[in-house]
């Protein structure tokens, strides 16, 4: 990976930040798309001797994405989409802006950004999308989040078929110990419930870097959760009826 150039979203917080730091450790040149340039400057001011470029872009603003411009001779060996959000509340409790924001950031913005970046991607570029185990299950009080991630997962699989020259890797994760939960559930009740099984962002970032190097198609963490959800998909209504608490743990 040394000397390659990756463009990353969501790189100033949580898992995205851990991924960026692992990329820099591997001598990768990084371009960050961020909404808050000052925040990025503060976070990475100590990264002396490492190549990192920051470009302002609001992923909730389609015009901001479409207006992105790069030098003609620039190319990207990898594109990591780590931006995302969710609100852990019932369908009826979501307001219009929360619904639109969820699908826009988790799904639509990736499509628009990929279209903008496509001319700058190398012929065998790595496309890494951070999805969720929520894509594989029905969850009360996380319907829009789960639906957006299910759509994203389907999209990544289709992209793999349509562009076999690209390395498409989807990362499906359970709860991670990151600031994501502060916005998803300000009460932090869900985070406290899941405290013992929270994934470590730094270890997950290590796994993602290894997955890029070895061209894995999927990373599923924690593995036990993914295996359990595979069983759930065989008879989903049966599991929902017999184990209702498992599907209402965000309430």
Predicted regions and their residues:
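Conserved NAD(P)H cofactor-binding loop of Rossmann-fold oxidoreductase domains
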Residues: 82-87
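C-terminal helical subdomain
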Residues: 170, 191-227
């Amino acid at each position: 990976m040394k000397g390659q150039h990756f463009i990353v979203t969501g790189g100033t917080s949580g898992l995205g930040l851990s991924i960026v730091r692992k990329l820099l450790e591997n001598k990768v040149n990084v371009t960050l798309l961020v909404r808050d340039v000052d925040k990025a400057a503060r976070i990475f001011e100590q990264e002396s001797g490492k190549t990192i470029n920051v470009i302002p872009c609001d992923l909730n603003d389609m015009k901001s994405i479409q207006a992105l411009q790069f030098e003609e001779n620039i190319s990207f060996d990898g594109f990591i989409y780590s931006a995302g959000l969710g609100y852990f509340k019932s369908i009826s409790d979501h307001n219009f802006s929360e619904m639109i924001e969820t699908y826009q950031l988790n799904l639509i913005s990736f499509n628009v950004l990929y279209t903008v970046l496509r001319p700058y991607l190398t012929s065998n570029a790595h496309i890494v999308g951070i999805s969720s185990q929520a894509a594989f299950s029905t969850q009360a009080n996380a319907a829009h989040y789960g639906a957006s991630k299910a759509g994203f997962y389907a999209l990544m699989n289709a992209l793999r078929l349509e562009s076999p020259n690209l390395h498409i890797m989807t990362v499906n994760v359970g709860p991670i110990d990151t600031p994501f939960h502060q916005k998803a559930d300000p009460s932090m009740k869900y985070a406290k419930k899941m405290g013992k099984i929270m994934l470590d962002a730094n270890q997950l970032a290590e796994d993602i870097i290894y997955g890029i190097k070895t061209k894995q198609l999927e990373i599923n963490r924690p593995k036990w959760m993914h295996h359990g959800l595979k069983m759930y998909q065989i008879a989903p209504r049966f599991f929902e009826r017999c184990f209702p608490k498992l599907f209402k743990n965000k309430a």
